[in-house]
Swiss-Prot record:
GO (cellular component) term, any one: i-AAA complex
PANTHER family: MITOCHONDRIAL INNER MEMBRANE I-AAA PROTEASE SUPERCOMPLEX SUBUNIT MGR3-RELATED
Disulfide bonds: none
Transmembrane annotation, as ranges: 54-74
UniProt membrane topology term: Single-pass membrane protein
Protein name, entry field: Protein MRG3-like
Localization: Membrane
MF GO annotations: misfolded protein binding
Annotated family: Belongs to the MGR3 family.
Length: 463
């Protein structure tokens, strides 16, 4: 939408049009392949008739005029008065001598008022797009209270509309959900009130998930196995580690490798139900982070497991899946520490529960061991994938490869910490050094510091 407001050449569109032109030209030469048709094109220009000259000249001029119109004229659905104001705002935002965000903000606010005067739909792409631009200017000017208020009003507007029982087309409903989740993420990132964030996050996330699942039967099967936002204790006896994705370990490794080896191809248009999948997964990650901040480790674990299942079903990019799995391994490890803390409390403090102490202790020990094993499984699966695909040796400078290396460094670090926890000092040192070496390749400085801190613990302990 916004790209058409610039009066400058659009590289992407130009490339596409040139590609189409080449295709047209190729077909044209094929079409004129007969001797009769070729004779026309082979006539020297000076020998052509006036009519031929006129036809060729007119065609060339028309072609140039069309391309100038297509490239430079703004193709958007804003009313003309609104578009005129928006151009001024964009110019102030990107001019070479320095962006004037305050001036841009004034223009965008003026454009919003003009939209109201033109009776533009308050939930349309155009109207909400201007509101988002206003929010961006507020953030760039460090006017976070104003940005928070704006996003909060937008969330209320979208929630009220999406909660209505009136019939809407699936396409429009999914557009509203996509926009709603985009604003929800922005609101959560700048608002300091964690309780408000949590309330709105759960409200909007549940609404989006309900609508999504109604149109995605394959995801309902996953839902039947684990709740969307379930804070209850997992049933550890029925929990099988890596097969939470619905596959055995070998099948999962095959799935990862097939994703890596698949050839690059033109992306097919998104199906309707996947239009807002990226925003939905981002919102779920926000909920996981909220659970971690509240020390609700069971809630965080359940949330992350379900999110990873959804990522696999939605065929998310490989690097996203591996990073999500590394995070899941960390959450499993945190849960193991929680159970270990409970065991320590039983052994060192009076316990007042009526249930036999040994039975409680046995259950906690089982849970602690299970979490530690599942954590190691997550990390080892990433390392196994990397070894089979010769990482980090084959890694390029691409963003995907850099993110895969990040997941790999986290996996080696995680295994190193687990080995240290179990007293396997030599193995721990080896894994931590690998984590540091890979982190240095991608300048993952935070992990380098953490791994070096763990190495000091290893070096300070007699082997």
């Amino acid at each position: 939408m916004w790209k058409y407001l610039h009066r400058s050449v659009k590289n992407e569109g130009t490339v596409e049009r040139l590609t189409n032109l080449n295709l047209f030209t190729n077909h044209r030469f094929k079409f004129y392949s007969t001797l009769k048709e070729q004779s026309f094109w082979r006539i020297p220009f000076k020998r052509r008739s006036k009519l031929q000259k006129w036809v060729l000249s007119t065609g060339i001029v028309s072609f140039i005029a069309f391309n100038i119109w297509w490239v430079y004229w703004p193709h958007h659905t804003f009313p003309k008065p609104v578009a005129k104001i928006l151009r001024k705002g964009l110019h102030s935002e990107i001019k070479k001598e320095g962006a004037n965000y305050q001036k841009s903000l004034e223009y965008y606010l003026e454009a919003l008022e003009e939209c109201k005067a033109e009776n533009v739909d308050l939930l349309s792409d155009e109207y909400t797009g201007i509101e988002i631009k206003i929010g961006e200017m507020y953030e760039k000017l460090h006017m976070y209270n104003d940005a928070t208020a704006l996003y909060g009003d937008m969330l209320k507007k979208f929630y009220n509309e999406l909660s209505k029982t009136t019939d809407k087309s699936t396409k429009r409903k999914f557009f509203l959900l996509k926009r709603d989740l985009q604003i929800l993420v922005r609101f959560n990132e700048i608002n300091k009130d964690s309780e408000t964030n949590a309330t709105l996050l759960i409200m909007h996330l549940l609404l989006a998930q309900r609508e999504f699942l109604e149109n995605s039967p394959e995801f309902k099967n996953v839902l039947s196995k684990s709740e969307l936002l379930n804070n209850q204790q997992l049933d550890w006896k029925n929990f099988k580690g890596l097969p939470f994705i619905g596959k055995s370990k070998p099948d999962y490794q095959m799935h990862l490798n097939s994703k890596r080896k698949q050839e690059l191809k033109i992306k097919e248009p998104e199906s309707e139900q996947c239009v807002f999948m990226k925003e939905l997964l981002t919102a779920r990650d926000l909920y996981t982070r909220y659970c971690l901040n509240r020390s609700n480790l069971s809630g965080a674990l359940n949330s992350k497991i379900t999110t990873l299942e959804w990522m696999l079903l939605a065929d998310s990019p490989l690097d996203d899946i591996l990073l999500a799995q590394a995070e899941l391994g960390s959450i499993f490890y945190l849960n193991s520490e929680k159970f270990e803390g409970s065991l320590y409390a039983i052994d060192n403090e009076p316990y007042k529960k009526s249930e036999p102490l040994e039975l409680i202790r046995s259950r906690l020990q089982e849970n602690q061991n299970s979490c530690l094993q599942y954590s190691a499984d997550c990390y080892k699966s990433i390392i196994s994938f990397a070894n089979e695909n010769q990482y980090p040796k084959v890694a390029m400078e691409s963003e995907m490869d850099q993110r895969i290396l990040k997941a790999l460094s986290l996996a080696h670090y995680g295994i190193g910490v687990i080995n240290l926890h179990k007293g396997r000092l030599r193995a721990s040192k080896k894994e931590l050094k690998k984590a540091i070496r890979i982190s240095e390749m991608i300048r993952f400085n935070e992990l380098i510091e953490e791994a070096q801190r763990e190495l000091k613990k290893v070096d300070g302990t007699p082997i």
